[in-house]
A protein has these predicted regions:
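Carbohydrate-binding/catalytic loop surfaces
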Residues: 87-105, 152-170, 216-234, 262-283, ...
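Low-complexity, Ser/Thr/Pro/Gly-enriched N-terminal "stalk/linker" regions
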Residues: 22-110, 131-155, 191
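Solvent-exposed beta-strand/loop surfaces of large extracellular or lumenal domains
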Residues: 502-527, 545-550
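Long, well-ordered core segments of solenoidal/helical folds
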Residues: 70-100, 133-150, 195-212, 245-263, ...
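Bacterial Sec-dependent N-terminal signal peptides
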Residues: 1-23
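C-terminal beta-rich recognition modules with glycine/proline-rich loops and embedded aromatic residues
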Residues: 23-40, 300, 358-367, 372-488, ...
Length: 688
């Protein structure tokens, strides 16, 4: 029987090639796609097909996970902010002239970047207005495909200020569109996407030997993993062998991150562009699905160790402004790097099940991301600094300077890529809170208030709510809201990640102790579940420290880094021309910032650090600003008079125990990094 099914699949796979001869998606082509897809036999959700490595976690269909609480508020602010109106705010690029809508305007990455975030936002919120903004981009991309499989803009135009329209053939922006179409299929099951990608990937297999990834630009070489993961995604749907051949070819032509790590490039500055690193670092693990040599995972892990040591910043990012630029806490970290590294971590945890990647993902999402975008989601910083004491228009010690606008909150301040690309961060984070598991269970891998609808057990739909104020509270409550079968109960395993920072978690089921679990593990509760059953997960949050540049110390509690609370004076400024937008905000403070923490016993942090929690603020929909921060930590500190402003930023960092402090001890207040704009998050340590 298995041999017969295999033969049928092979025959149908061969027949699918004839789709490429169709002018477009005819009824005959649709029948062939239907036949091929119907042969896929899986559990509740599709895992990797042989010979690809089976994944321990599987992404759920787009729209299965809905945000609640503060996360829902974040996405609504995003919808009402820039994400929902880029065509109005940035019409020169996102308007009707865009090449990805058939116009003669910008035809490179920026338009696809926006849709790569807008599409998941639209379907997660189930918002018809946003879906209507997305659909013309989908339709034009699908209809643009040529007979040979190529798609997208294909005519170059003379340069025009503010537009990128002279490299229409480049492989790179098409990789972003492939991500968009994957998500669109996940939300809609539009079978045109399958035929479209099949045709394009045959074109790539035929064309890449003559016009490799680096033929038009180097960007595609560094970011080929986004192309590669789309190839594997399609292979899991159709099983066509040529896709595996293309997978090997894309890997061979891509930049070798393994060689980069082996050369020690990440131990030196300026060896790679910061966003290329954020996007491309997942390539070895994406390819590991096809070539299961452990060296691919080991290289990525070693790469992250090098990044942490030589470029690392406490909010989960690294000094990269735009080249990798060391770990001084006044070096910038680009917003594109944050959202792209989040996506890379989401994919790497799915493939490996390694919860180090999930811990890292939360560190970025709960610290770096909310700090770099304004509360109304209308402006952003191109770069952020861990020690950021002035947000002004001024040239700083960055690898790239854009007329001093890189720290300013604005629309096109710095470089426009981040204004176009920032939209994917929170929607994709929401989409990857939950995963399906091969044992027909469900896994809560990253935590935030949400609700998931998924099939478990013997393909039984369930609805599970997650109620929490995490990451600013330690308790997470899961409730089985619905079991959609006749008996209203179903047996399935419930997987729960326990972060490494948690010494020991407690899990209770319906009020009774179920188990305790050490940090850094996945707990599994496997039982018969029925409506209104509850799981309570307790993740005790203790204060601890981490050590950074010049032996500086950061204060952490749970997944959050804490930073000096400073008065923030926001002032709107007008630009004389529109190159960087029409306006920007500068943020300044009259508060002192040059504190060193008074030396303390790291083993007695619960006594040294005084934690206060405002339970009323834990009821607010939006915790991510200074006013609403529900958790504060008090620490003893002394001023360091020699630590002064340099170049409108914190001057050279005093080495811990070498700086001379002045005056008596003072009590300073720390709040979550993600609630700050001005801050010190890496403190020198001084004597008592």
């Amino acid at each position: 029987m298995k041999i017969r099914i295999f033969a049928v699949v092979c025959l149908l796979a061969a027949n699918l090639f004839t789709i490429s001869a169709q002018k477009w998606f005819t009824p005959e082509a649709e029948k062939q796609v239907d036949a091929l897809l119907s042969q896929v036999v899986e559990g509740n959700y599709k895992n990797n097909r042989y010979p690809l490595l089976r994944k321990p976690l599987m992404e759920l269909p787009l729209g299965s996970i809905k945000p609640k609480g503060w996360l829902h508020e974040m996405l609504v602010r995003q919808k009402n902010g820039a994400s929902g109106q880029m065509d109005v705010l940035y019409p020169s690029v996102m308007g009707k002239r865009n090449g990805w809508l058939g116009g003669d305007g910008d035809q490179w990455e920026r338009g696809p970047y926006w849709i790569d975030g807008l599409l998941p936002l639209a379907y997660i919120l189930d918002d018809d207005v946003l879906k209507a903004k997305v659909q013309p981009w989908i339709e034009w991309a699908l209809q643009s495909q040529r007979e040979d499989g190529f798609f997208g803009p294909e005519k170059d135009y003379p340069g025009e200020p503010g537009l990128q329209r002279d490299n229409s053939q480049d492989w790179w922006p098409r990789m972003v569109v492939l991500k968009i179409l994957q998500q669109y299929y996940s939300a809609t099951n539009d079978k045109r996407v399958v035929a479209f990608m099949t045709k394009y990937f045959r074109y790539q297999l035929n064309t890449l030997p003559q016009k490799p990834l680096g033929h038009w630009s180097s960007w595609a070489e560094f970011r080929a993993c986004d192309n590669l993961q789309a190839v594997y995604w399609l292979y899991n749907l159709t099983g066509e062998d040529f896709l595996l051949e293309l997978g090997h070819l894309l890997h061979r032509q891509s930049f070798s991150f393994i060689d980069m790590v082996d050369r020690g490039d990440l131990r030196r500055p300026c060896t790679i562009h910061c966003v290329n690193l954020a996007q491309g670092i997942k390539e070895p693990i994406i390819y590991y699905q096809q070539d299961t040599d452990r060296k691919y995972i080991d290289a990525v892990k070693e790469g992250f160790r090098d990044i942490r040591r030589f470029h690392g910043q406490p909010q989960g990012m690294y000094g990269g402004d735009e080249a990798m630029h060391g770990n001084n806490p006044t070096q910038g970290s680009e917003l594109c790097s944050a959202v792209e590294l989040m996506y890379s971590l989401e994919k790497m945890v799915e493939i490996t099940g390694d919860i180090d990647f999930a811990d890292h993902l939360e560190r970025i999402a709960f610290n770096a991301l909310p700090a770099q975008i304004s509360d109304d989601f209308m402006t952003k910083q191109y770069f952020q600094q861990p020690n950021q004491v002035m947000v002004t228009r001024h040239r700083r010690n960055f690898d790239q300077d854009h007329e001093g606008t890189d720290l300013a909150f604005g629309t096109l301040t710095g470089y426009p890529c981040c204004f176009s690309n920032m939209h994917q961060g929170w929607p994709k984070f929401t989409q990857h809170l939950w995963y399906a598991t091969p044992d027909n269970g469900i896994a809560a891998i990253v935590y935030s208030p949400s609700e998931v609808t998924a099939n478990v057990g013997d393909n039984v739909p369930v609805v599970i709510s997650e109620d929490t104020y995490y990451p600013m509270d330690h308790q997470i409550t899961f409730t089985i809201k619905e079991v959609r079968n006749k008996v209203k109960q179903v047996k399935f395993p419930f997987h729960l990640r326990v972060p490494k920072w948690c010494k020991q978690a407690e899990i209770r089921v319906n009020g009774k102790m179920e188990q305790t679990v050490k940090g850094g593990k996945i707990a599994i509760v496997d039982r018969i579940w029925k409506r209104n059953d509850k799981i309570e997960l307790y993740l005790p949050m203790e204060v601890f420290t981490s050590t950074w540049y010049e032996n500086a110390v950061s204060i952490e509690r749970g997944p959050l880094v804490y930073a000096l609370k400073m008065e923030e004076n926001w002032e709107k400024k007008e630009f004389k021309d529109s190159w960087y937008g029409s306006y920007y905000y500068q943020v300044t403070s009259s508060d002192p910032w040059n504190y060193g923490l008074v030396d303390f016993d790291r083993n007695r942090m619960n006594e040294v650090a005084q934690v206060s929690i405002n339970s009323q603020k834990q009821q607010l929909d939006f915790p991510w600003n200074q006013e609403n921060a529900p958790v504060e930590i008090k620490m003893k500190a002394r001023l360091i008079p020699t630590w002064t402003v340099y170049n409108e930023m914190a001057g050279p960092q005093p080495f811990s125990f070498c700086g001379s402090a002045e005056g008596g001890e003072q009590e300073i207040t720390l709040i979550p990094y993600g609630c700050t704009t001005l801050r010190i998050s890496e403190f020198p340590v001084v004597g008592k």
